[in-house]
């Protein structure tokens, strides 16, 4: 069954394995999440649990939000997200979900929102090849052909310049190197999407090796 937790990306560092190998890791702070709601097939059409992470001031939340979290006897949360495919009987409303649900060596999928890069050209945004840079060439870094003349339009999906980044990305099959239960930290091998302090979702790998 799937298990997951919401956290915040702290940054990257490196640790040494027992054999002396240097391992680059991303540090994710996953303070205890609270189960705000259990969604059932009878009431909602699907099964899921709703997790809340990172308390926020009541002054910044509205009445429906306060009433919703009151059922779980907790404070309003800054980040709320649903997890499907979990073992529903293992969770109760108001229960805390901590980093101890994971252990070192587990393979997980990590979801976050990539860093925004602003308006970028087709070469940086899509990895296209540039034209000759030598004297006489009139084609360097432009997008190139827009397609055939006859349709009198540009087809959807044409790779063009535009806003880059700021998209939800999932990196699959990352290994948990260490779980620090005292400080609510997960050390995950490699890099994960998102800027520092951004929201990260860590879930059991869908395509685990």
Curated annotation (Swiss-Prot):
InterPro entries: Ribosomal_uL3 (IPR000597), Ribosomal_uL3_bac/org-type (IPR019927), Ribosomal_uL3_CS (IPR019926), Transl_B-barrel_sf (IPR009000)
Protein's GO biological process: positive regulation of rRNA processing; rRNA processing; translation
Keyword list, A-Z: Ribonucleoprotein, Ribosomal protein, RNA-binding, rRNA processing, rRNA-binding
Spans annotated as Disordered: 122-152
GO MF annotation terms: rRNA binding; structural constituent of ribosome
GO cellular component: cytosolic large ribosomal subunit
Family: Belongs to the universal ribosomal protein uL3 family.
Protein name listed in UniProt: Large ribosomal subunit protein uL3
Organism: Bacillus subtilis (strain 168)
The gene coding this protein: rplC
